[in-house]
A protein has these predicted regions:
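Exposed loop/turn and edge beta-strand positions of beta-sandwich/beta-sheet ligand-binding modules
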Residues: 4-6, 16, 34, 114, ...
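Non-catalytic accessory segments flanking enzyme active sites
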Residues: 1-32, 49, 56-58, 63, ...
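Short strand->helix junction
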Residues: 27, 45-47, 89, 205-206
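Short hydrophobic segments within beta-strands
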Residues: 23, 39-40, 121, 199
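Short substrate-entry loop that stabilizes the transition state in hydrolases
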Residues: 28-34, 39-80, 152
Length: 233
């Protein structure tokens, strides 16, 4: 009972054409209501494809009864070099807006999606964006963040991708350009409200453990229902 992926496009609030895929669960009944899981890809320079994926098994994720939404947000590959570079200087805000807009359109066009039960999650850059959603919206009932940064500044100082961070964020951290100030999720900690599962590998050198610990500390300090899972590798 493997449903096909349903493709759709929309024009974002910034005038960009955004590609998406929707997947229904096994035993799908269009007369019923299903929770929506917004699955966020990492990278950001990669893309969701209509194919079998070993790392992310679409049908396995949908099996508990979720409708899955996959959005190729700004910065995704496969749509030309210019499209991939739109995330430079705007690493989180626009991509986050596009994820929310995609969910709005999926809910509008498919009556079987329960708008009151939305979840979002991802790993690596997908975790970064899940954390940005924590900072900017309360629409999701829960969030899942694997190896996601919560603090641009400490991520710059401990990750192995310092140069790439500077390109995306408009310069080194000490110059304190607008991205460092305005698109750093931890600066919005007072607004955090959404229950969250935080996971990370203890030996992750791309998004080191410290960022997950910072996030966990904020969630606990804010008394937000949350769990931290650290893998020993």
């Amino acid at each position: 009972d493997l449903a096909p992926l349903r493709h759709f496009w929309f024009t974002s609030s910034k005038g960009r054409r955004i590609h998406n895929m929707l997947l229904t669960p096994p035993g799908f009944d269009p007369s019923k209501k299903y929770p929506l899981f917004v699955v966020i890809h990492g990278g950001p320079h990669t893309m969701w494809r209509d194919q079998w994926v070993l790392r992310w098994n679409y049908h396995l994720l949908a099996a508990p009864g979720y409708v899955l939404l996959f959005t190729n947000y700004s910065g995704s590959t496969g749509f030309g070099e210019a499209a991939a570079q739109t995330i430079q200087g705007d690493p989180l805000r626009t991509a986050g807006e596009e994820l929310n807009e995609a969910a709005d359109i999926a809910i509008r066009d498919h009556a079987y999606i329960d708008a009151t039960r939305q979840c979002a999650g991802g790993a690596s850059y997908g975790g970064h964006l899940a954390n940005w959603l924590q900072a900017t919206t309360t629409r999701y009932r829960c969030l899942i963040s694997h190896a996601g940064l919560i603090n641009l500044e400490s991520q710059w100082g401990t990750s192995d991708t310092i140069y790439g961070r500077e390109i995306n964020n408009g310069g080194p951290v000490w110059e304190q350009g607008p991205v460092w100030r305005e698109q750093n999720p931890i600066r919005y900690a007072a607004q955090f409200r959404t229950p969250t599962l935080v996971t990370v590998g203890e030996r992750d050198f791309r998004v080191p453990l410290n960022n997950s610990l910072e996030y966990w500390s904020v969630l606990q300090r804010q008394q937000i229902p949350s769990r931290l899972l650290v893998f020993p590798d």
